[in-house]
Amino acid sequence: MKLILTVFSLLLCFLLPTSEALARPKIGLVLGGGGAAGIAHVGVLKVLEANHIPVDVIAGNSMGAVVGSLYASGMSVAEIEQVSKTLDWGKLFSDDTSHQLKSYQQKQQNADFFTVFESGVSKRGIKLSSGLIDGQKLIFELRRLLAPVAQISNFDRLPIPFRAVATDIHTGDAVVLKQGNLASAVRASMSIPGLFAPVTLDNRLLVDGLVSNNLPVDIARQMGADILIVSNIPPDNSRKLDTALDISLQSMDLLVRKTSEAQLASLTPQDILIQPPVGEVGRLDFTRVAETVALGEKGARTQLVALQRLAGSLSSDANQFATPAHPIDEVVKVASVQIENDSSLRESILRKALNIKPGDVLDNQRLQDGLNRVYTLGYFSLVDYKLTQLPSGDYGLKVIAKKATEGEHRVSVGFSLGDDFNGDTRYQAGVKYVQKGLTDSGTELRAQAVIGRRLLAEAEIYHPLGIDGTFVAPRAWYQEGDANSLDNAQQVAKIRAREARVQVDIGHPVGNSGEIRAGVFHQKTKPLPKDGTPIVADKTLTEAGVKLQYQADTLDSINFPTKGGQLTAAYTRGVTAMGSDNDFNRIELEADRVWSVHDKHRFIASGRAVATANNGAAVLDSGNNLETHALQTGHLVFSDNAPLIGNETVAGSVTYMRQVAEIPEIAKVHVGASVGVSQAWQQRDAVDLGGLRNSGTVFVGGETPIGPAFVGVRKTQGADHQAYFILGRDF
């Protein structure tokens, strides 16, 4: 019996932890909110890791929740630092979807000049979003970063147990987030009131935890922490209160200070408080990430003696405290797909966009792509998801598509201004109204009106015929605008053209970048000569017939693209039996291509050609653009900013552009130069490529809140040098 007890005792000595291990206190890490200044937490983690200090539980708020969740997911400090330095924070805090990811219809809608202001409207008036930013890009990025633990719904099962803090906006109570989707929890924790839209989780409307508990010391203690390491971002007491934003941020700092005082007072002598000296880093200053991380390290080193004392009291085995590795990704097989949709769109449209079916094997990239396609339908402010493991081991996917808070009636305003500093000042101002959801298939009414150098009144109904994307689009417009007409490449007639057109198209999308249309049209144009001898008869011209058109857009940006291109190819058949003055055939080609070299150097090649057969009348314009497209970018601007048009037209340009500076949070500044040629003829017999007119321009340009802005000098063959200024996207 004694022998058995002896052997059993020896086995216990080998199998059970030592008394030192059993007695090791649990270390809790508390990371407070602080906006961009909260990135200093990464520097604090670097010092903890360098001194082999383990972290057993983490509680964080706002930016502290972001950094804390990444660390809790198993990401190393080096990886977190790399992420913080390489993320485009400016894009994350914008809801504008990448131009490349939009459908062709959305690209067309967003390429006009109605960019100054947009809101929803209702019988009660203007309907604004519940936040300046809905946060769709942010939640996508959080999903990507936290993908390795996306299937873990209990935050105690993370490599390091974690809690995020948010605030119930109805009651003001702190809400501890300990289960669900980790990315959604973090997003809720950083929903700064007024800046980010609130997040609904478990039927509670949540905003940033700064309102109730910015420094969740008590939460870490509730998780069982014996010793706390607290990284607190102190308020900026030196901020100049010059602007409304300064006042708003100062008000939030005062609120944060009040909610943090009680938490700081609860710290014990064995707890360690770290306060990074980030006073000069603004709450929205994401351009100083590397500096902010270094300030976090600096703040942690002020407590280096206490940290090293803690490390020495725990264990001499550094490897024991290494950050847990990422969990191995599970193969997620989807057994069911539910869609929670509160918009007017029928569910089948969302399912087609999602493109995930029961039985599919799901990876994070495919899921994100599907959610993004649903978001870009244009009806939603946020598209989130939940994955729930079923008893079978497979997963149920639930997609939550939250309709846009501004509703389905949208109004947007546009404005542009141009000046040649020689008495020719032009402006355009307009309003656009879009009513979505006329039917559950996504029918839209689109109407717009513009005044200024060009007058326009237009209405279109866009009606999808099925979920495959086929649509019908009746359209009518009236417009007035300036144009040039050339005879034998010599004489210029300056014309004010009045145009009325009705058109009915049937079309189909070509992938995500293009569209093909076929339709019938009837157009009347009244040319009114302005200067010079007119070469078109002073009578109403009628064109009627059929038109086939293909358009594609693969640009990555509408104003300052770095890659991709645009293409328009159209065939028009004029038919006298349909009311046209002449039977004619016309082919139009227009293309742009962008190449980048070493990131900041770009080359843009543009060309346009029109060829017409069997038309004795002068052609004014067969599209919806009497003003020059080149005015939108300033690359190819002719003497009076009106396009050269005729039965036979050739134009081309090559542009070099380089980004030379960046004004933080405002604009990227570009310089560039362009050379081009163009000419138009009314008769094919008169075509002479030797008579092409040369032109050139140099410019400085950049983005502004209402569109691109350019200042430059242009030179056209036979004309003097001319300075010009353009603000906003022209129509």
Each predicted region: which residue ranges?
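Bacterial N-terminal signal peptides
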Residues: 6-17
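Flexible glycine-/small-residue-rich
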Residues: 166-168, 178, 276, 341-343, ...
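Patatin-like phospholipase
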Residues: 21-61, 69-383, 388-389, 403-405
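Outer-membrane beta-barrel and related beta-rich outer-membrane complex signature
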Residues: 243, 484-488, 525-532, 579-581, ...
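C-terminal outer-membrane beta-barrel translocator/porin domains of Gram-negative envelope proteins
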Residues: 376, 396, 408-420, 543-669, ...
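Acidic/histidine-enriched alpha-helical segments
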Residues: 238, 308-325, 523, 564-567, ...
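Gram-negative/organellar outer-membrane beta-barrel architecture
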Residues: 365, 370, 382-555, 625-634, ...
